[in-house]
Amino acid sequence: MHDVEILLVEDNMSDAEMTIRALTRKNLANNLLHVKDGAEALDYIFARGSYEGRHSSKPKVILLDLKMPKVNGIEVLQELKSNESTHEIPVVVLTSSKEDPDIRTCYELGVNSYVVKPVEFEDFHKAVVELGFYWLLINQPPH
């Protein structure tokens, strides 16, 4: 298995499928892993639980929903940004929440970008493709 470049953390299967489809059409989803909640995301990132023993390479970007079961996106973001080994991983919140407290909290915790999911399919598709191009091909993270 290749190193995961995009970790998609999304509990809504329709949104996950649209995101994967948009990235696949532009050949940006070759190394994408979809997890369904925040607990699974943290297990993957920290190589614990069902991911224990996996090669612990870090994704190039995490696309993170906020409103999820078990562990919500804000809790995931807080754990990632407060941990020395993961604080530099770019995290893009991709959510339906336009709530100012959510936006403020995410930026206070160190989110790299906060994107409200467009309602229309074509707008959603375009936004996801642009995110993929930027975070995988244009952005230069620290090594």
Where are these regions (language model features)?
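Acidic, metal-coordinating helix/loop segments flanking the phosphotransfer/catalytic sites
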Residues: 18-20, 33-61
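Receiver (REC) domain active-site loop signature in two-component systems and cognate sites
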Residues: 66-68
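Hydrophobic residue at a beta-alpha junction
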Residues: 70-71, 80
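Hydrophobic/aromatic residues positioned on beta-strands within the core alpha/beta folds
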Residues: 92-94
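C-terminal output helix
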Residues: 40, 119-132, 136, 140-143
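Conserved acidic carboxylate
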Residues: 10
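Short, glycine/charged-rich "phosphate-handling" switch motifs in NTP-dependent
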Residues: 112
